[in-house]
From Swiss-Prot:
The modification Phosphoserine is found at S19. LRR repeats lie at residues 40-61, 64-86, 87-108, 116-138, 139-161, 162-184, 185-206, 208-229, 231-251. Residues 337-356 are annotated as: Disordered. This is Leucine-rich repeat-containing protein 58. SUPFAM superfamilies: L domain-like (SSF52058). It comes from Mus musculus. Residues 337-346 have a biased composition (Low complexity). Keywords: Leucine-rich repeat, Phosphoprotein, Repeat.
Length: 366
C-alpha cells in the first residue's frame, strides 16, 4: 500500500478507498515495527476510505497515538479499540453514520481518554442527543457536533469545565440552557442554524467569550445582560426575526388589584412589619422590581411592559435588548398635543413600521 508520510511519526492513508480489512495487515505490520522503534506513531490519518468499523489492529498497537482521523467513512460505531489509545488527544470522526445506540464504546467515561482527549469532532453525523459519556470527558477543549440532529443541550454540559470551543450549529436546538454559562474557559460558541428563540441572561457570565454565532435562529431580542460580554469580538445575528415579530406580538395585561395595592405600598413607602401581614404577602412585597426608567421611580411585580431598546455595543454594534417597564407610559414619550387621537392612531402602525425598519438597519446582522 502506498503511503503519504509527512514525517516518521505520521501515517497518512487518506482517500485510498480501502476497507478496514485491507488496513488490518498494514497496521499490524506497522505496530510490530514501532515496538522496537525509538519514535512512536503520533498521527494516523484514515479519512475518506471505506471503513465501516475501526481497524482491530488499533487495539494495543499504538499506545502513543495522539491524533486519529477517521472522517468521511461509513462508521456506525467507534469500537472498543478506541479505549486502548491512552494518549489520544484529537479524534476526528466527522461525516460518518454515528448516532445510533452503541455509537460510542462502553466505558468511555472510565477510560484514559477521559483525561487525555482534548479535541473531538463528530460533526456531520446522526446524533439526536449528546451522549452522556461525552459529558464526562473533562479534558475536552474543543467539541464539535455541528450538522447532526440534536434537539437540546443537556444541563450536564457544565461538566466540561475545560471547554474553549463549542460548535453545535446546524441542529434543531430550541433552548440554550443556563448551565452553559458555567464554562469559564469558553472562547467560541457556535449555535447558528438552529431554532433558538431566546438567549438566557446567564450567558453574560461567559467572561472569556470572544465569538458568538447565533445567526439563522428565531431570536426576537437579546437580554441586556449581554453587554457584560466585554471581550466579545465577533457577534453574528443575521437571519433572525429580532424586533419585527416581537413588536407584532407585544401585549400588555393590566395589573391585578393585588399588584396595584402592592405598588402603592412601595411607591408611597407605607411602613409595615412582619406582624402586620401574612407571609405570602410579605414575600410578594419583597419581590418588587424597580422600573429602569429614570423619570418614573415606579415598581412592578408580575405585570410589566416589555420594550426593545437599541444599545451601542463595543462601539460598532446596535443591539436590540429587552427592558421591563412598569407601564406603557414609560415605554415611549408623550405624543404631541397638536395631533388628534384619530390621526395619531391611524399613523401609529406606519410610524412603528418605519422606526423598526430604520433600527433594523443598524442591528448587526453578521
Amino acid at each position: 500500500m502506498e503511503e503519504a508520510a509527512l514525517g516518521e511519526a505520521e501515517l497518512n492513508w487518506s482517500r485510498l478507498s480501502v476497507s478496514a480489512e485491507a488496513l488490518e495487515s498494514e497496521l499490524e505490520a506497522r505496530a510490530e515495527e514501532r515496538r522496537g522503534a525509538r519514535e512512536a506513531l503520533l498521527r494516523l490519518l484514515l479519512p475518506y476510505n471505506r471503513l465501516t468499523s475501526l481497524p482491530r489492529a488499533l487495539g494495543g498497537g499504538f499506545p502513543h497515538l495522539q491524533l486519529l482521523d477517521v472522517s468521511g467513512n461509513s462508521l456506525t460505531a467507534l469500537g472498543p479499540e478506541l479505549l486502548t489509545l491512552s494518549g489520544l488527544r484529537t479524534l476526528l470522526a466527522r461525516n460518518n453514520r454515528l448516532g445510533g445506540p452503541g455509537s460510542l464504546p462502553k466505558g468511555l467515561a472510565q477510560s484514559p481518554l477521559c483525561r487525555s482527549l482534548q479535541v473531538l469532532n463528530l460533526s456531520g453525523n446522526c446524533f439526536q442527543e449528546l451522549p452522556a459519556s461525552l459529558l464526562e470527558l473533562r479534558a475536552l477543549q474543543t467539541l464539535s457536533l455541528g450538522g447532526n440532529q440534536l434537539q437540546s443541550i443537556p444541563a450536564e454540559i457544565e461538566n466540561l469545565r475545560s471547554l474553549e470551543c463549542l460548535y453545535l450549529g446546524g441542529n434543531f436546538i430550541k433552548e440554550i440552557p443556563p448551565e452553559l454559562a458555567n464554562l469559564p474557559s469558553l472562547n467560541y460558541l457556535v449555535l447558528c442554524d438552529n431554532k433558538i428563540q431566546s438567549v438566557p441572561p446567564q450567558l453574560s457570565q461567559l467572561h472569556s467569550l470572544r465569538s458568538l454565532s447565533l445567526h439563522n435562529n428565531l431570536l426576537t431580542y437579546l437580554p441586556r445582560e449581554i453587554l457584560n460580554l466585554i471581550h466579545l469580538e465577533e457577534l453574528s445575528l443575521r437571519g433572525n426575526p429580532l424586533v419585527v415579530r416581537f413588536v407584532r406580538d407585544l401585549t400588555y395585561d393590566p395589573p391585578t388589584l393585588l399588584e396595584l395595592a402592592a405598588r402603592t405600598i412601595k411607591i408611597r413607602s407605607i411602613s409595615y412589619t412582619p406582624y402586620d401581614l401574612p407571609g405570602n404577602l410579605l414575600r410578594y412585597l419583597g419581590s418588587a422590581s424597580n422600573c429602569p426608567n429614570p423619570k418614573c421611580g415606579g415598581v412592578y411585580f408580575d405585570c410589566c411592559v416589555r420594550q426593545i431598546k437599541f444599545v451601542d455595543f463595543c462601539g460598532k454594534y446596535r443591539l436590540p435588548l429587552m427592558h421591563y417597564l412598569c407601564s406603557p407610559e414609560c415605554s415611549s414619550p408623550c405624543s404631541s398635543a397638536s395631533h388628534s387621537s384619530t390621526s395619531q392612531s391611524e399613523s401609529d402602525s406606519e410610524d412603528e413600521a418605519s422606526v423598526a425598519a430604520h433600527r433594523m438597519q443598524k442591528v448587526l446582522l453578521g
